[in-house]
Amino acid sequence: MTVGTTIGRAPSATTTVVEQLAATMAALGTTDLFTLMGAGNLRLVHHLATGHGVAVHHLRHENGAVGAADGWARVTGRVGWCTVTQGPGFTNTLTALLTADRAHSPVVLITSDSSGLSARQAPFAGGVQGLDPELLLDPLGLPVVRARAETAAADLVTAHRRAVEESRVVVFVVPVGIDLLPAGDPPAVAAPVRRPVPEPDAAALAAAVAAIASSRRPVVVAGRGAVESGAGPALRRLAALTGAHLATTVRALGLFEGDPADLGILGGFSTPEAAAVVAEADCLVAVGTSLNFFHTRRSQFVTGRTVVHVDADAAAFTAFDEPTVAVRGDARAVAERLGAELAGRVGERARAVAPVPGGFADVSAPGRMDPRAVSVELDRLLPRPRRVYVDNGHFGGFPIMHMTHDRPGSLVWLPEFGAVGSALAASAAGALAEPDGQAVLFIGDCGFYLTMGDLELAVRERLPLVVVCMNDGAAGSELAHMKDWSVPPEQAVFGYADLAAAARGMGAQAALVQEVAGLAPALRDWDPAAGPMFLDCHISRDVRSPLYDHV
């Protein structure tokens, strides 16, 4: 995209607002669109597909359309575009909108608004489906850009710019009826620029250096901001210099792969051995992470020790526990400065070595597999490079903790709103975005029941997606809570259904797997060129996810 380039030609008598919106989206670099069409957006979808060669991916639920755009944005780093119709089409998107926004995914949702129509003249669109989207979006804190007939294309450019610069969801609202009006002048488009990060304060930097230099058992924790700034090598050098152990959040997992000091994930998914190391630390150096209550096990990992917190966003320092020293700045730049300053202040220190995680006793029984054993076997069987998507639910900790995620982004977990069923559409979009990699989704039976229609996209477009349904025939999270709260469990147990048959009925290749040895032959029988493979894995309810000890 060229800075300052004008889109299209001066409008002619036949150029409409909707045609200009489609041209603007194409000029902004839109290659893929995720949608569930309705009366309010079908013209836009038509013009994008036929006039601009945009690949249109049709979902069967509006929440899936937004979820797919979110997945696309997470994998590509580009704006995810999605569109739905007015009224109930819009309200169906709210869960996915909050998930994407809390993940800081740059997503633009285009929705129509029929609330301004006369119910007499348009009894369905105006009377039945009429709803002002801002009535719901404003209380949720989701930004809205409303199109005006004379400036609609320029308004869309504004929505796109905000999504990129603020790294969040923006909802672009198009009032029904303006789409067929004559378009105004085409807008100029400048490539959006991320907000600049300030140089670190010298006094804060000096305080951080002093705190780290005086520590004897430091742990360096990297988050998403460290990944995005390319801080990995500088943080490895900092750890080697100070004798620190290394750890990451889930979104940075794999950043320190192969380093002997790497403890893996900090927080609820820490191994017992890693948690013991962090519990003995006297200084936590958190770089590019919010250091939220999951990371710190409800403050246990930060209480009574020095915390040096480095982030580009000053809001990170007050969102959770207050750090001892806060340094605002780019993660890589600050890490390099810390290393340079500490090189002359710390004596020779022994390199930290992470403890070897312990194993587990496989509790698989006839017809019911240990979910840890399933994860370990699939880690061995599934090809690389791969990207593993994990939905929400009790099962999620097992593929996160018992599979290898060897680079940042190779694990995509969607916990931001805690919504079951967030990942199926996202994983399908990821498979679209990375045709040369292997996309693998782990989802529970409850999540699959909620979003089963999203599988149809993968079937129709023949996406080589592996869907692993961790089917415990129950509401697994609620079982864990019921046990903790001494509530009888029978209301959370539903029984094991043959979900492979359901997936097969939708056109997927599928296998019911009830023993770990059955995974290999099921995958051998899969033809990736023919579309997705659905593995209905019947797992035991007797293995508790360690995350539930800390939530």
Where does each model-flagged region fall?
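N-terminal alpha/beta PP-like core and its mobile active-site loop of ThDP/TPP-dependent enzymes
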Residues: 2-342, 384, 464-467
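Active-site flanking residues adjacent to catalytic metal/cofactor-binding acidic residues
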Residues: 112, 287, 310-312, 390, ...
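Generic recognition of flexible, low-complexity loop/linker segments
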Residues: 159-160, 206-209, 235, 273-274, ...
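Flexible, glycine/charged-enriched surface loops at secondary-structure junctions
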Residues: 168-171, 345-354, 534
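A short, charged, Gly/Pro-tolerant segment at domain boundaries
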Residues: 175-180, 357, 366-370, 374, ...
